[in-house]
A protein has these predicted regions:
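Cytosolic-side transmembrane-helix boundaries in multi-pass membrane proteins
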Residues: 1-23, 29, 33, 216, ...
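Membrane-interfacial amphipathic/re-entrant helices at transmembrane-helix boundaries
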Residues: 2-70, 111-112, 116, 198-201
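Short loop segments and helix-boundary regions at transmembrane helix junctions
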Residues: 4-15, 78-87, 109-183, 221-226, ...
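Hydrophobic core segments of alpha-helical transmembrane domains in multi-pass membrane transport
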Residues: 17-33, 70-74, 95, 99-101, ...
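Single transmembrane alpha-helix segments in multi-pass membrane proteins
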Residues: 30-35, 45-105, 118, 122-141, ...
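Transmembrane helix-bundle core of multi-pass membrane transporters
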Residues: 54, 147, 151-224, 277, ...
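Helix-loop-helix "hairpin" substructures at the membrane interface of multi-pass membrane proteins
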Residues: 191-277, 301-302, 306
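Transmembrane alpha-helical segments in multi-pass inner-membrane proteins
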Residues: 257-338
């Protein structure tokens, strides 16, 4: 059997994901062609809708913010050999944590209530991920199974609380009252207007800056700290980690807590940045898209930011495309996103093997 060719790092990180996206769009183009629409025109409309105006860019980055947080949450768990697919539940609990602070303390000035709400969102997300980690360490319950279960538990708990405990009195919708202005994270156009910089209005808020800070934090933590080295060691070889004196259980608990805290930050973008209240299903599937983002980004913060922007383009551009081409429905945009996930994740080998073959031939010809 021939020895598999190891791709250069630049090819693995950039070339393979780009080719996966290209193949996914080609397949999606065939689907669009099959319903009688022009795939080239559809692609142009999608890109124009996402990047063709200041407002479109704002919406694209707003969606990307959610994907950055969930992508980072999945990625840091990946590095420890864990598969945290409970981002939905952790984000939901993060929203609950932020809402409880805002409902009780939004009479306080913004410089008190906002940090408390953000910390509460992170703490609730961390707790909701810590428990499955604890169950795996102490009881042997696999984290994949427990995080799936905790997604449903979080959704059920929040529904109960919204209907029976913290919901707005007299409201037919399961949601809380609107928070006071002091508990609202400023929109980016509002923040920049303070410095005399004008940009179009959009839901993009200061949480995008927090997402970039979180990306830098994960990069420093994973690759430039002792804890990060321990996390990567456990992920690469638990046996080697044990021989090195690293507690696998401790690393599992810490990593899951950090992962959950990052997922909880999604609630900051949605609840504090846009909605201004807690309502049902605000996470809208962002937690599961985060898995694809982490895979496409090769679990590296830079790759995750770029992959998040790509999915932000698909979300925003797809919305505009469905208006211009009614036959290209929102469900079809979801299918296109699914194709990107398919080729970037499950069928990654279909792209990697041909690329590796090309590099192998280049190496032989250069020998």
């Amino acid at each position: 059997m021939s020895t598999p060719i190891e791709l250069p790092k630049w090819a693995d990180v950039s070339l393979v994901p780009i080719l996966a996206v290209v193949v996914a769009f080609l397949v999606a183009g065939l689907v669009v062609l099959g319903i009688g629409e022009n795939p080239v025109k559809a692609t142009v409309l999608l890109i124009q809708g996402a990047l063709g105006s200041g407002e479109g860019i704002g919406y694209t980055l707003y969606y990307a913010t959610n994907f950055i947080f969930t992508g980072l949450a999945v990625a840091i768990a990946f590095h420890a050999g864990l598969f945290n697919i409970g981002g939905e539940g952790q984000a939901t609990m993060g929203g609950l944590g932020a809402a409880l602070i805002c409902l009780r303390l939004d009479f306080l000035p913004w410089y008190i209530v906002l940090p408390l709400a953000i910390l509460s969102a992170m703490a609730m997300g961390a707790l909701w991920a810590f428990i499955p980690g604890y169950l795996q360490v102490k009881r042997g319950s696999h984290v994949v199974i427990t995080t799936i279960m905790f997604n449903f538990l979080a959704a059920t708990l929040v529904v109960y609380l919204l209907v029976n405990v913290i919901g707005k009195p007299g409201s037919m919708s399961p949601e809380t009252r609107v928070f006071a202005a002091s508990a609202h994270l400023p929109y980016l156009h509002e923040a920049l207007a303070y410095f005399g910089i004008k940009i179009p209005k959009s839901p993009l808020n200061l949480c995008f800056v927090l997402a970039l800070i979180a990306s830098a934090f994960v990069w420093v933590l994973v690759w430039h700290t002792k804890l990060g080295y321990a996390i990567r060691t456990v992920g690469h070889s638990p046996t080697a980690a044990t021989y090195a004196g690293i507690s696998i259980g401790r690393i599992t608990l810490i990593t899951m807590a950090i992962s959950g805290a990052l997922a909880g930050m999604l609630a900051v973008n949605e609840i504090l940045g846009v909605q201004g209240r807690l309502l049902l299903e605000f996470s809208s599937g962002y937690g599961f898209i985060g898995i694809a983002v982490a895979l496409m980004g090769r679990a590296h913060p830079v790759g995750i930011v770029l992959a998040s922007i790509l999915f932000g383009i698909l979300y925003q551009g797809g919305t505009e495309l469905s208006f211009e081409m009614p036959r290209v429905t929102r469900d079809m945009i979801v299918a296109i996103s699914g194709l990107v996930i398919l080729f970037a994740g499950a069928l990654d080998g279909l792209i990697r093997r041909p690329v590796a073959g090309v590099f192998a031939r280049l190496l032989k010809s250069g020998a």
